[in-house]
Amino acid sequence: MRSGVLPGVISVIICARNEAGGIGRLIASLKPYYEEIVVVDGHSKDETAALAEQAGARVVLDNGRGKGDAYQVGIRETTGEIQVFMDADGSHDPAEIPDIIRPIEQDLADLVIGSRHRGGSDEWQGDVTTWLRAMGSGFLSVVINARWKSNLTDVLNGFRAARRSA
């Protein structure tokens, strides 16, 4: 699973809130490949933080101001040159980390955003709420692409990788 980067170069940041059901499995799947795994806990009411620590992650509390701020906490708390951001709900496959960091390693990008619209995601299977979320993400992607002349397909996806300097 691990790409050709040196140990300690990649930090995995997981934003979590009330994810006790799967956080341990996610961290266990990452631990053999990545040394620095930080869970930014959104003041969970369940055992998310304890289970994350038990699985080998370092846990820090977010400041309660939303996911963007939780990402900032994770960035401050990690040391890697490349930071991988994942949701704790199991919607992102750790086996895809080498693919998402490759453009950064090859100096082709400073930021890579995963896309649920490119295939391989089962997150869009579901009810009306899921459909509305997909429509909102699509609309926002169109607006951002028009404004910044980019070619993004899923700007709201939490599976990302970024160079620290970005």
Regions inferred by a protein language model and the residue ranges of each:
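Acidic donor-binding/catalytic loop of UDP-sugar-dependent glycosyltransferases
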Residues: 47, 86-103
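Donor nucleotide-sugar binding loop of glycosyltransferases
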Residues: 19-22, 44, 67, 93
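N-proximal low-complexity "stem/linker" segments adjacent to membrane-targeting elements
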Residues: 1-29
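Acceptor/aglycone-binding surface of glycosyltransferases and processive sugar-polymer synthases
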Residues: 63-65, 69-77, 95-166
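A short, conserved beta-strand element in the Rossmann-like catalytic core
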Residues: 43, 91, 117
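Short aromatic/hydrophobic "clamp" motif used to bind/position activated sugar donors
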Residues: 83
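Active-site acidic Asp-centered loop
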Residues: 42, 86-88, 113
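A conserved acidic beta->alpha catalytic loop
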Residues: 41-49
